[in-house]
Amino acid sequence: MKQRSVVPAFVLGLLVLLGTLATPGLAAKGGQGKKPGAKAMTFEVCKHGCRYRTIQKAVDAAGSFKAKKRNAKVKTVVAIRPGKYVEGVVVDGTLRKKRFDGLTIKGTKKNRKKVVLEGRNAKGELGAAQNGIEAISVDGLVLENMWARNYQSNGFFVHAATDGTQHCDGYRMDNLLASANRSYGLFAKGCLGGKMLDSAGFHHGDSAFYVGETPCDRKTWTNHGTAPPPGPCQRKPQWTLLKNLRSYENVLGYSGTNSKYVKIVESAFYNNGAGIVPNTLDSEGFEPNGWNLFERNDVFWNNYNYFLAGAKFRTVSGGLGQVGGATVNYPTGVGIVLYGGANNVVKRNNVFGNYKWGIASFSGPGEIFVANEGDDAKSINNQIVENAMGRGGADPNGEYDFWNDATGGGNCWADNGPASFAPGNGKVPLSEIYPGCPQTEVLADQVRSLDIEAGLQINFADTADPRTILGYATSNPPQNQECSWVRRVAPHPAFEKFVPVEVAPQPGEVSC
């Protein structure tokens, strides 16, 4: 009897040993297991051999795991092996018995093209999948090493819910690629702080990168008032950083409706309809856009006329609205557009080869012909300084390097080197339209969003005058905007390894 008992004990010990040795192998095949005291839990996704074959199922499992009290401090990671995943992933932080804060979703390879989220034929709860990954009210989300393409709305979308407890703070999007999504590539809305890093986007019906509707400390915040000055949107600003991005062949390279505290640095915006375009619109909360920094970017060759039949993508917008019965569109052929912005700093950028204007700034009128219902889109207190325009004459911008509509106040231009300035009708001196720095800051209600004297915002004798912003933006048909483009050099001189891309009109498509 004693001799028989030795064999089972030996076998049992061997099995325990083998089980211990096998644990890493199970993880490698997509198993999930957490050692006591572990600081991270990984949920692996792959087409064959993993526990999870879809990203959504792994995300759901991670959310359920994190929701358990004993796992609250454990980091959760969804690791996706190379492959094409035809699905739309939703990370819903409002769900009960799920917790997604701090979740990382990443491709296992540094080559972001190895993990493809495919929108064509992807299904969602209500039909076609709208987004590659959509995260709702999740703090600290990390998205890395993926490519999202062909979705009905957006590639990667993080936003706050609208239930009064909204939050989506501190996200990080890193080494992502987005292409051919109907609206946006990397899209953040209603968030406090975040990062978009080392990523690229092309062929979007709005913009490759978007940060919008930055929330303020109070939902009732406004920059209206004359005395005393209104307080800041955020007393302790939480900044969003966009760095080392490549945005090309989109309607807009960057769009930021009512965005605030955004830094865009060391990035390239080229071959878009327009390059960097922060803007103020009634369509979203917390107007206006402002308090942003755009520094050390290359902004060039933004001459993609996406209104033409030969364009590789279509604008998702039917226009920005109506002014005087005419449809307003974003101006094309422009490097940087400050639309209705306050306290933005445009500094040390390299702006060249844009066929209309290098850097344009203007208000959205809130009176007479109304473009902004609350008169929130006033161009005030912006600084445009130390920019290099036209590559020293080798690749000039088109009509002018700088164009300003003479509205608002407190704006200034300085140390931009040799440059050209749109003069208007000559009734207002250039020194008043483009005053030097510094200037005394103004309050929004001390200045007007309408100017009829300088002939830059509107020409009442010819409302279609393309030298004015309203005449140019209401060109009809819109592809006729290019009728007033000025191509000062042909072809563009080489710049690094970039290649200029434009759309050739078909016979009769542009009527100048």
Please state what every model-predicted region is.
Residues 102, 106, 139-150, 167-184, ...:
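Right-handed parallel beta-helix
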Residues 315-316, 326, 367-369, 377-512:
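Acidic, glycine- and Ser/Thr-rich low-complexity intrinsically disordered tracts
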Residues 1-11:
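Bacterial N-terminal signal peptides that target proteins for export
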Residues 39, 47-53, 71-82, 88, ...:
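Right-handed parallel beta-helix/beta-spiral solenoid domain characteristic of secreted/periplasmic
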Residues 22-66:
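Right-handed parallel beta-helix/beta-solenoid
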Residues 55-71, 86-96, 265, 348-349:
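Short, T/G/N/S-enriched strand-turn elements that build extracellular solenoid repeat scaffolds
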Residues 10-20:
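Bacterial N-terminal signal peptides
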Residues 67-68, 85-91, 120-131, 152-158, ...:
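Short glycine/acidic-rich loop motifs that flank beta-strands on beta-rich extracellular proteins
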